[in-house]
Regions:
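ATP-binding/phosphotransfer module of carbohydrate and carboxylate kinases, centering on a glycine-rich
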Residues: 1-66, 77-80, 99, 103-107, ...
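A short acidic/small-residue loop/turn micro-motif
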Residues: 33-35, 91-92, 159-162
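A cytosolic small-molecule/anion-sensing beta-strand core signal
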Residues: 72, 79, 148-149
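A charged helix-plus-loop insertion that forms the helical arch/lid used to bind
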Residues: 81-91
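General beta-strand structural signal in soluble alpha/beta enzymes
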Residues: 109-114
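Anionic-ligand binding patches
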Residues: 118-120
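Glycine-rich phosphate-binding loop of actin/hexokinase-like ATP-binding domains
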Residues: 127-179
Length: 295
C-alpha cells in the first residue's frame, strides 16, 4: 500500500495528514500556529517536524509515500512550486516552498491554491455527480476554487479564481468577507476587536450588534458570489473555512443579496451549502493532486 501526505497551510495555522492512496484517512496532526515562529525557515522547520512526527506515529516508511501535497493561500505558481506575493501569508512571499520541503523531507512535494484543493476535495467526497462545483473558503482571506468536468480550473496561467483580490467597494473583495471584516466591525460597534467566535456567540444570544455585523458580512459575500455565479453558473457552491461555522448567522442575508443580482440562482436549483468536511476536503484534494501528478 502507498500513502500520501498532505499539508494545509492557512493564513494563521498549519497541519498535516496522512492518507492511503485510495484517499482513506490514516492520521491527522493537531494545528500549529504560524505566529509562534519568527521566520520563514522556522515555520518550514516546524512543518517538517510535524510531518516527520506524524509519519513516525503511524510507523510507515518514507519509501511507501507517493508524495506530499500542500495547500496554501494564493496567488501562487503551482508548476514552479512557488508561493507568490500572497497578502495573507507575507512570510512566504516569492518562496519556493516545494523545493525546500522536498529537500528536507525527502518526499516529492507539490502545491496548489488551498481553495482549489478544497473544491477538489468537496467534489470528490460530496458532489462527484456534478460537473461544475465552486468551493469558497472563508477565513483569514477569501478563496475560490472551481471544478469543471472533474478538473481544477486553473486558467491560462495557473492563477484563475483569485477573485478575493478583486476591487470591491472599499478595498478588495476579501477584506469585506473575511475574519478581518468581523474584527473591524466589532471594533466599530463594541469598541473592541472581537473574534468571529465571540460575535457568533453574541448573535445566538440575540445581540443586535452581532446581528448587524453578520447581516452586513452576508450581504458582502452575497454580492461577491453573485458576480461569480453570473460568470460561471455553477451547480454547487460549497462554503468552507473557519468562518463557515457561522453559516447560519450570515446565510439569510447572503442568499437575499444573491437573489437580487443572479438570474441563474433564481431560475435554476443552484445549491449553496456549508461544507460538512471543511479542512478534510483540502487535505483530500491535496492527496488527489499528488495522485494526478504521480500516477
Amino acid at each position: 500500500m502507498k500513502y500520501i501526505v498532505s499539508i494545509d497551510i492557512g493564513g494563521t495555522t498549519f497541519n498535516s495528514g496522512i492518507f492511503t492512496d485510495s484517499l482513506n484517512q490514516v492520521a491527522i496532526s493537531k494545528k500549529d500556529k504560524i505566529r509562534f515562529y519568527k521566520s520563514k525557515n522556522d515555520v518550514v522547520d516546524a512543518i517538517v517536524k510535524q510531518v516527520n512526527d506524524l509519519i513516525d506515529s503511524v510507523n510507515i516508511s518514507k519509501t511507501d509515500i507517493l508524495g506530499l501535497g500542500v495547500g496554501a493561500p494564493g496567488p501562487l505558481d503551482p508548476k514552479k512550486g512557488i508561493i507568490l506575493d500572497t497578502p495573507n501569508l507575507k512570510i512566504f512571499k516569492n518562496y519556493h516552498i516545494t523545493y525546500d520541503l522536498t529537500k528536507k523531507l525527502r518526499i516529492d512535494t507539490f502545491i496548489d491554491n488551498d481553495a482549489n484543493l478544497f473544491a477538489l476535495g468537496e467534489w470528490l467526497l460530496s458532489y462527484k455527480k456534478n460537473d461544475i462545483v465552486l468551493g469558497v473558503t472563508l477565513g483569514t482571506g477569501l478563496g475560490f476554487g472551481l471544478i469543471i468536468n472533474n478538473q481544477i480550473f486553473t486558467g491560462g496561467n495557473g492563477m484563475a479564481m483569485e477573485y478575493g483580490l478583486s476591487p470591491f467597494e472599499w478595498g478588495i473583495a476579501e477584506k469585506n468577507a473575511c475574519i478581518e471584516f468581523i474584527r473591524n466591525k466589532s471594533e466599530d460597534l463594541y469598541g473592541e476587536r472581537l473574534s468571529p467566535v465571540k460575535v457568533e456567540e453574541f448573535y445566538h444570544n440575540g445581540d443586535e450588534k452581532a446581528k448587524i455585523i453578520y447581516n452586513e458580512f452576508g450581504k458582502n459575500l452575497g454580492k461577491v458570489l453573485s458576480h461569480v455565479i453570473n460568470m460561471i453558473d455553477p451547480q454547487i457552491i460549497s462554503i468552507g473555512g473557519g468562518l463557515s461555522k457561522a453559516f447560519d448567522c450570515f446565510s439569510k442575508s447572503m442568499i437575499s443579496e444573491i437573489k437580487l443580482y443572479s438570474p441563474s440562482y433564481n431560475v435554476n436549483q443552484i445549491i449553496i451549502a456549508r461544507s460538512k468536511l471543511r479542512e478534510l476536503s483540502t487535505m483530500v484534494g491535496a492527496c488527489q493532486m499528488v495522485k494526478n501528478i504521480k500516477e
